[in-house]
């Protein structure tokens, strides 16, 4: 499981010209699920993301998490994060969880995230999404 998180001033996801999720300040989270991933592993990663201190505190240091910064979370599934890229010139998506299993786990993780944090928006699993964002920093981290 991999999460690419970006601190944003705003972000939104569109599918077929319709906005499916939108936040102002907060975290844009791209989430990739691998064959061996579990709900428990995902919950631990979500907890880490929600507690990860990458927002400026009163001293201008990265001391606040998304809740303390009064931000939102935009959660977007992205199987390409699981690609093996060490060999050749074409990504190998073999390590990614099969779509039917990944959809079920992704939906459980969305539900879990919403149980832990109030302002959670999402894309649509496996849809052709257009993601618009304004990076803040930029500040980007790859969490596993």
From Swiss-Prot:
SUPFAM superfamilies in alphabetical order: DTD-like (SSF69500)
Any one Gene Ontology molecular-function term assigned to this protein's record: Gly-tRNA(Ala) deacylase activity
Keywords recorded for this protein, A-Z: Cytoplasm, Hydrolase, RNA-binding, tRNA-binding
Keyword Acyltransferase carried by entry: no
CC per GO annotation: cytoplasm
Reaction catalysed by this enzyme: glycyl-tRNA(Ala) + H2O = tRNA(Ala) + glycine + H(+); a D-aminoacyl-tRNA + H2O = a tRNA + a D-alpha-amino acid + H(+)
First-listed, main subcellular location of the protein, grouped into a coarse class: cytoplasm
Superkingdom of origin: Bacteria
EC number: 3.1.1.96
Alphabetical list of InterPro entries matching this protein: Daa-tRNA_deacyls_DTD (IPR003732), DTD-like_sf (IPR023509)
Keyword Cytoplasm: yes
GO BP annotation list: D-amino acid catabolic process
Notes concerning its domains: A Gly-cisPro motif from one monomer fits into the active site of the other monomer to allow specific chiral rejection of L-amino acids.
Family as reported in the entry's similarity comment: Belongs to the DTD family.
Protein role: An aminoacyl-tRNA editing enzyme that deacylates mischarged D-aminoacyl-tRNAs. Also deacylates mischarged glycyl-tRNA(Ala), protecting cells against glycine mischarging by AlaRS. Acts via tRNA-based rather than protein-based catalysis; rejects L-amino acids rather than detecting D-amino acids in the active site. By recycling D-aminoacyl-tRNA to D-amino acids and free tRNA molecules, this enzyme counteracts the toxicity associated with the formation of D-aminoacyl-tRNA entities in vivo and helps enforce protein L-homochirality.
Assembly and interaction partners: Homodimer.
Protein name: D-aminoacyl-tRNA deacylase
Source organism per UniProt: Acinetobacter baumannii (strain SDF)
Gene responsible for this protein: dtd
């Amino acid at each position: 499981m991999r999460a690419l998180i970006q601190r944003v001033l705003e972000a939104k996801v569109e599918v077929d010209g319709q906005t499916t999720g939108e936040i102002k300040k907060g975290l844009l989270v791209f989430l990739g699920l691998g064959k061996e991933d579990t709900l428990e592993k995902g919950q631990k990663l979500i907890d880490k993301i929600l507690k990860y201190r990458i927002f400026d505190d009163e001293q201008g240091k990265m001391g606040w998490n998304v809740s303390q910064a009064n931000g939102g979370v935009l959660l977007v599934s992205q199987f390409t994060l699981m690609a093996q890229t060490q060999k050749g010139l074409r990504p190998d998506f073999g390590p990614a969880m099969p779509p039917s299993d990944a959809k079920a786990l992704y939906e459980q993780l969305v539900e879990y995230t919403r149980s832990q944090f109030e302002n959670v928006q999402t894309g649509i699993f496996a849809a052709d999404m257009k993601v618009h964002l304004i990076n803040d920093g930029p500040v980007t981290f790859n969490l596993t």
